[in-house]
Amino acid sequence: MNKNELELYTFAVPKLELGDMQAGLESFDFIKKFLDKTLLAIDNIKNNLHIFNTLYRGEHINELKDLISIKNTIDKVIEKHEYLDVKNKEVNGVAGLISLTLAAEKLPILLDHVNENTLKVLESSVVLLDKFIADVDFRKSFMKSNDALGSKVWRKNINIETELTSFVDLNLVTDTVKIGQVIPNLYSLKIIHENLVTAGKKTQIFNLKKIEDTIESIVDRVKVIEGMMNNTEDSFTKQAISSVGDSLSDLGNMVRYHSLVYYVTAEVSKVAINIVKTLEKINK
């Protein structure tokens, strides 16, 4: 993993703050610039999903095959080596990996969350945006809803950023990692392997194209809303469009985290694979 590659997945989507929203009520140009910036960020994330989908063709991430292939090697590695003898051995690493054990434990949970919610919320957002465009009364009520595009549903019961940063520092990029820094002992490789295989099976690559297409649908709707913005003097419509912009920020970050969880799963799996393969080659 290199810094440029990681940055594709970690930049934040712009968010419309309350003060900006009030300014936006007074200036169509302000709202349009914000929407353009948000849509550009979302479009960049969509492109990253496409890149990921291209690199990891098939049903799951490519690393799943390698994980399954090393299963029988793990017991041999544990029997062959003492932890104290190999803990300072370096293997190809991941950006700021803090704990391989914790990563393997939490990634299946994070994957369940993004798989269950991302596409569902995006698809429901298309329906809501269609209604926003067609129904004046709905536009008036839209701005009163704190969860207009379903982002709170997606965040329910889990904070993805907190969970990710508990086992990986996304601001630190390294080429290698010491075995002793990421696992407490060699026996932990067995449960790590089991959890990462579970995570690998949860990486539903085939859904990424659906997510891309749904994002494109959202972009199309927002372009229509931009057109509405240029042809109205109605204050309710102005404020409602500001609310759309704010909700789009949440949707953009939702997709960013979805792709980031998939990406981290692949990179963390590589570390486990590299540890086992490296130790297999070392003579005791």
Task: Identify the meaning behind each predicted range.
Residues M1-L102, K106-I109, V114, T118:
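Leu/Val/Ala/Ile-rich N-terminal alpha-helices, chiefly Sec-type signal peptides and the beginnings
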Residues K65-K284:
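Long, low-complexity or tandemly repetitive, helically biased scaffold regions used
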